[in-house]
Amino acid sequence: MSIKDEIESRKTFAIISHPDAGKTTLTEKLLLFGGAIREAGTVKGKKSGKFATSDWMKVEQERGISVTSSVMQFDYDDYNINILDTPGHEDFSEDTYRTLMAVDSAVMVIDCAKGIEPQTLKLFKVCKMRGIPIFTFINKLDRVGKEPFELLDEIEETLNIKTYPMNWPVGMGQNFFGIIDREQRTIEPFRDEEHLLHLNDDYELEEEHEITKDSTFSQAIDEFMLVEEAGEEFDNEMLLAGELTPVFFGSALANFGVQSFLNAYVDHAPMPNGRITKEAEEVSPFTPDFSGFIFKIQANMDPKHRDRIAFMRIVSGAFERGMDVKLQRTNKKQKITRSTSFMADDKETVNHAVAGDIIGLYDTGNYQIGDTLVGGNQKFSFEDLPQFTPELFMKVSAKNVMKQKHFHKGIEQLVQEGAIQYYKTLHTNQIILGAVGQLQFEVFEHRMKNEYNVDVVMEPVGRKIARWVENEDDIKDKMSTSRSILVQDRYEQKVFLFENEFATRWFEEKFPEIKLYSLL
């Protein structure tokens, strides 16, 4: 197979949703169809000892939530699929945001009983901003939920995107009979013992079946006819432009509607996209020379070996193990001899990969999130990845002073992952951590204890707002007040931590010569 054919066979997507909509369960079932796993662990069944493949970290298995992005790869038909299962919890939205920089499409999972929820809306807006095509899977049809038309209206009105139902449910909850496939004009029954039923051109079953006597069936057929006659036409160009979302109904937990979704996804999802450089030029995936960028760093995927993996999205050309590449930030060449593919925490050596693939590079501290790696004599760097402004701040120290070495190593590695942000006071060197949400602190504390054997003491600093300084040379010590703390971030940039909005405005009025700015 040529490099061009290999690249065109890649499908790389993220799954986004509000917590508990069924995102991780859908991921598991897709892996089952890809033959990547034999048995799906369910999120709810924590007592059974089975855990979701994508929830590989100990804290995830204990809590039944995803707090880090996982990468899973499998082959399906003639396609090579990369799934990025993102943190569902809003406190980890920064990790999710960066993950969305590395995909070509997204699957939005919606709980049929709850519709569009806050985290779904937030992540959808990121996809929309980036022009990422979105596929929608409306989940849990075997439970009572909102009516299908109500859900479609909610998607269209809340998200300002057109919908095209690829299938249509016959009932829901206890009366859930199955789904009508629009393209095949078949009804797939929910019960295993039933076989496919076929509709003729007049929307009638081609064979006798007791379901025709049920009002649920006649209502579903009426709705389906209305969708066929008055709904949107399917337009693949609109899908690729992020203006239309194909909608699939099903139940991930019951493994129903998942394979038909996967079949449609590989038919319609885009092949790998290029990426824009800082020089505002696009690098095509078919550019012969290799290029890629680091979008995530994960420490301790194997706690026994204290390893660190840098996740790289290949943007162009082909990667070969042992090749020489240049890290643009340092302008230094390096030979990549240790590279890996993923099934959550299971790893396998990668000798060859192409544009669209996600691979892991063993990291001894060389890489940072957002780094560009290139082959040949290429000189560009890709655009920086976003960083969020934290809203919560805690002082942190080791409970046992004899554990300082492990304490500092743990902080260094977890900060480099981008899971938490690091600050240090200028004169006392007190470490302050910043987070978007409280759960980040809880996970940090848990991982320090379990992965680095360090108990930490955390104490709020009473500050809620971080503002970076453009003109650092104009700062004077007296500008730190009882309502603000002057600190440095991990890149030694000056940052003021303010008590509240009032304190921020007071500072800006008192010191107009100091130019402050925030991140995302």
Curated annotation (Swiss-Prot):
Ligand binding (GTP): 17-24, 85-89, 139-142
Alphabetized Gene3D superfamilies for the sequence: P-loop containing nucleotide triphosphate hydrolases, Peptide chain release factor 3, domain III, Translation factors
Pfam family name, one: RF3_C
Coiled coil: none
GO biological process per UniProt: regulation of translational termination
Annotated localization: Cytoplasm
Cytoplasm as UniProt keyword: yes
Main subcellular localisation: cytoplasm
Domain of life: Bacteria
GO cellular component: cytosol
InterPro entries: EF-G-like_DII, EFG_III/V, G_TR_CS, P-loop_NTPase, PrfC, RF3_C, RF3_dom_3_sf, RF3_GTP-bd
Residues annotated as domain tr-type G: 8-273
Protein purpose: Increases the formation of ribosomal termination complexes and stimulates activities of RF-1 and RF-2. It binds guanine nucleotides and has strong preference for UGA stop codons. It may interact directly with the ribosome. The stimulation of RF-1 and RF-2 is significantly reduced by GTP and GDP, but not by GMP.
Protein family according to the UniProt entry: Belongs to the TRAFAC class translation factor GTPase superfamily. Classic translation factor GTPase family. PrfC subfamily.
Protein name: Peptide chain release factor 3
Organism the protein comes from: Staphylococcus carnosus (strain TM300)
Lineage summary: Bacteria, Bacillati, Bacillota, Bacilli, Bacillales
Gene: prfC
